[in-house]
């Protein structure tokens, strides 16, 4: 089980007027949580309760979910438990609405919505664990006959795999990520803004880039027709880090340069 007790919430939430009106609820008490669980018929995971005590639902700045299976989903907000808020577990557009009215499968609890406007939703999936166990987090796609895609083994891991989108992340936020996280962010986002992505890397300083990041930037140069600059980056990578992808990308850059 992955909890959020020591999670850094700085910059996670987008506290706009819309968020306060439709998502963000009052501070929660243990009694509120027990009442919500009784109404829903499920024990809520510890990590979700920790989120509620930090922020009772809301719109997220870190809205891009990426996991190790290369699934990429863009989140709008995470539901709280204040029934007076439209987008909450017990609200007008809450769990009962999506399952009873929109006919999403009754596999658990709708915990977050996406930028699709209701055409795919994020669920706590209790099918394997039962109503008192630790649910997985899945995406249910209405447009694909309510197909179910696993996203994370638990809610804590789901939250920890939310990233800022390329368009919104600051240089400081990007540089605070590990190299693995940087590459994951750059590789998996749909419709990536190459100009901003390259800027994020070059602002670190070419001489400060690891072989992994040099390769990522070189690939972007290849994709934007900057073959000579790509070759220069690939040549900076030492022999020990030249795997099959290095030879492929470097060869591609040389072929592109010869064809100019």
Range-by-range predicted roles:
Residues 1-118, 176, 182-185, 189-195, ...:
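A surface-exposed partner-binding patch
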Residues 190, 256-260:
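Short coil/turn linking the two alpha-helices of tandem helical-hairpin repeats
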Residues 202-208, 236-241:
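Solenoid-like repeat scaffolds
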Residues 182, 217, 250-252:
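Structural register within alpha-helical repeat arrays
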Residues 221, 254-256:
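Residue at a conserved register position within TPR or TPR-like alpha-solenoid repeats
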